[in-house]
């Protein structure tokens, strides 16, 4: 039996930009730079990536509350974010409950090294194919907007 579909991202703010137009403006050179997932992607020009990837509570705070409530997360639970970037969503889990055990993994060494200070040591460089954790270790595993990176 297939479970019911839920949308736990419904409170994530919608973009006001024309995404299709932005996609058309990017050159193959922009895409090649972006695929390195380094400083240019996270904190460089908007045509290459995020255009300055900074923490803003408007993005994940309410989403994290909904996820936590839906899965009935409690103190001590272990949460993994695969494709965590700089760890902004994990930071909001930490703010919601500092007793959550949070872990993140991302392919970008730059993102992991430039994460929010309180997350230092909780994020690792790695990929979704070979996670450096034992099976069934986590109470919740999240991976949002990462499928395009899988080969």
Regions found by a protein language model. Give the residues of each.
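N-terminal auxiliary segments of SAM/dcSAM-dependent transferases
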Residues: 1-33
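Conserved alpha-helix/loop element of class I SAM-dependent methyltransferases that forms part
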Residues: 57-74
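Class I SAM-dependent methyltransferase SAM/SAH-binding core
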Residues: 88-130
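A conserved beta-strand element that flanks and buttresses the S-adenosyl-L-methionine
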Residues: 142
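A short, conserved alpha-helix within the catalytic core of class I
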Residues: 150-151
